[in-house]
Regions:
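Short, exposed beta-strand-loop hairpins at the edges of beta-sheets
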Residues: 107, 115-131
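Extracellular Ig-like/FN3 beta-sandwich strand-entry sites
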Residues: 72, 111-113
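Surface-exposed loop/edge segments in extracytoplasmic proteins
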Residues: 83-90, 124-127
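Short edge beta-strand/loop segments characteristic of extracellular beta-sandwich folds
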Residues: 60-67
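Exposed aromatic-hydrophobic patches
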Residues: 63, 98-106
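Conserved aromatic beta-strand anchor motif in extracellular beta-sandwich/beta-rich domains
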Residues: 77-81, 118
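Short proline/glycine- and polar residue-rich coil/turn motifs
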Residues: 92-98
Length: 135
C-alpha cells in the first residue's frame, strides 16, 4: 500500500473552511478543527468529502486542520481496516496553525469498513473518522 502525506502552511490554512462539531484539545492547547475523508486535495482544501468511497477513485485522503498549534509537534494518522491497523503516518505540525493530510492507494482487498484515528504526540486520540470502501 502506498502512503503519501503533505502539509499546508499557516497562511494556506486561513483559506480553509471552518468545521462544526466537537473540538479536541490536548493539555498543551493543540486544537483540532477539522478532520475529513475526501477524494483529493486541491488548492489546500479537501475535495469531495465523503464517508463512502468507490474503489474506482483509487486513492483516499484524510485532511486535518489544526486551529491552534502552540509549539512544533507531531500527530499520527492511524489507518484501520476491519479493526486491524494497516498503516501509521507521522505528520509534523508548526505553530500557530497548520493543516496536513495523508492518503492510501486503494486495492481490491481494501473494500469494507475503515476508521482513521488521529492521535497527538502523546498518542492521545483526538478524533476518530469512520468511512467505507465499496465496489
Amino acid at each position: 500500500m502506498v502512503l503519501w502525506a503533505g502539509s499546508l502552511t499557516a497562511g494556506e490554512l486561513m483559506a480553509q473552511e471552518s468545521v462544526t462539531g466537537a473540538v479536541a484539545n490536548d493539555s498543551r492547547g493543540l486544537t483540532l478543527g477539522q478532520a475529513v475523508m475526501c477524494e483529493g486535495i486541491k488548492d489546500y482544501a479537501p475535495v469531495n468529502k465523503a464517508v463512502v468511497f468507490s474503489m474506482e477513485i483509487g486513492k483516499i485522503y484524510c485532511f486535518t486542520s489544526f486551529d491552534h498549534v502552540p509549539e512544533k509537534t507531531i500527530v499520527y494518522h492511524n489507518w484501520y481496516r476491519r479493526d486491524k491497523l494497516v498503516t501509521t503516518k507521522r505528520l509534523s505540525l508548526q505553530p500557530p496553525q497548520w493543516s496536513t493530510f495523508s492518503s492510501i492507494q486503494l486495492r481490491e482487498a481494501d473494500k469494507g469498513p475503515w476508521r482513521l484515528e488521529i492521535k497527538d504526540q502523546a498518542k492521545k486520540v483526538l478524533r476518530i473518522v469512520k468511512f467505507s470502501v465499496t465496489d
